């Protein structure tokens, strides 16, 4: 697939398979196209004037850019967690229940169950169970990011996209997010953009290296980090440029 912003070709001839129930890390220097590629996977680039995708991106064999695709339904299946925590200015409970309510769920007992299971899934329940109806803005940065993950889990996605989810967090919060990602891959396919080579090596099963809008190399993380085929991959991983 190719991505254009107007006449500018931001991504060139990208061909990449994302394995199910694995963590795939997208690495590369700033401006290489990895975040642009991530946003293609749930059509977030649709929100940018002049952006268009040529080629196909399939989820379970169906082209997500085909005419008539319900983009809201797609984004329910392919959730996204952004670089900086973005909780809504409402209670912790209402943040998590927001998605299910948008999709028509009104039964309190069902919402209660979704909220608890989503917060448990994001390893946050024990920290907030006694203050569910307090503002989410009172949480720490790391807690807010886990709340945003819980909010994504609440609509039962198949894929989770994460755009540098720990870059704005302290080391302890980052470690919790990384541990959570390792746990979540048993149930979800995860694609994560990261500038942190050590983080990519720790948490991912597969790694894809982007440079100047091209996919240079991808494969099992151990292979990419210890025996890359392309000299540019080795130069980036070893810090010769970036």
Curated annotation (Swiss-Prot):
CDD domains: ABC_PstB_phosphate_transporter. It comes from Symbiobacterium thermophilum (strain DSM 24528 / JCM 14929 / IAM 14863 / T). Keywords: ATP-binding, Cell membrane, Membrane, Nucleotide-binding, Phosphate transport, Translocase, Transport. Pfam families: ABC_tran. ATP binds at residues 28-35. It catalyses: phosphate(out) + ATP + H2O = ADP + 2 phosphate(in) + H(+). The complex is composed of two ATP-binding proteins (PstB), two transmembrane proteins (PstC and PstA) and a solute-binding protein (PstS). The keyword Isomerase does not apply. Part of the ABC transporter complex PstSACB involved in phosphate import. Responsible for energy coupling to the transport system. It is a peripheral membrane protein. NCBIfam families: 3a0107s01c2. It comes from the Bacteria. Belongs to the ABC transporter superfamily. Phosphate importer (TC 3.A.1.7) family. The keyword Translocase applies. GO terms for biological process: phosphate ion transmembrane transport. Residues 1-237 form the ABC transporter domain. One of its GO terms (molecular function) is ATPase-coupled phosphate ion transmembrane transporter activity. GO terms for cellular component: plasma membrane. Its EC number is 7.3.2.1. It is found in: Cell membrane. InterPro entries: AAA+_ATPase, ABC_transporter-like_ATP-bd, ABC_transporter-like_CS, P-loop_NTPase, PstB-like. This is Phosphate import ATP-binding protein PstB 1. Coiled coil: none annotated.
């Amino acid at each position: 697939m190719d991505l254009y912003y107007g006449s500018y070709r931001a991504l060139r001839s990208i061909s990449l398979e994302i394995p199910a129930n694995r963590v795939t890390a997208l690495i590369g220097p700033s401006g290489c196209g990895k975040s642009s590629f991530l946003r293609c996977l749930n059509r977030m680039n649709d929100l940018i004037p002049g952006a268009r995708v040529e080629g196909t991106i399939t989820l379970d064999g169906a082209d997500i850019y085909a005419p008539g695709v319900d983009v809201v339904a797609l984004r329910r299946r392919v959730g996204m967690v952004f670089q900086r925590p973005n909780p809504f200015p409402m209670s912790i409970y209402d943040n998590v229940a927001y998605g299910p309510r948008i999709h028509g769920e009104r039964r309190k007992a069902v919402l209660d169950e979704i909220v608890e299971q989503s917060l448990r899934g994001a390893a946050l329940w024990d920290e907030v169970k006694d203050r569910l109806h307090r503002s989410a803005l009172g949480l720490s940065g790391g807690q807010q990011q886990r709340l945003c993950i819980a909010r994504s889990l609440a609509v039962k996605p198949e894929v989770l996209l994460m755009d540098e989810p720990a870059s704005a967090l302290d080391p302890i919060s980052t470690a919790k997010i990384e541990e959570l990602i390792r746990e979540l891959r048993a149930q979800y396919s995860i694609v994560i953009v990261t500038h942190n080579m050590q983080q990519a090596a720790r948490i991912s099963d597969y790694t894809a290296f982007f440079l100047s809008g091209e996919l240079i190399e991808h494969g099992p993380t151990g292979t990419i980090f210890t025996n890359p085929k392309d000299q540019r991959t080795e130069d980036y991983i070893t810090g010769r440029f970036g």
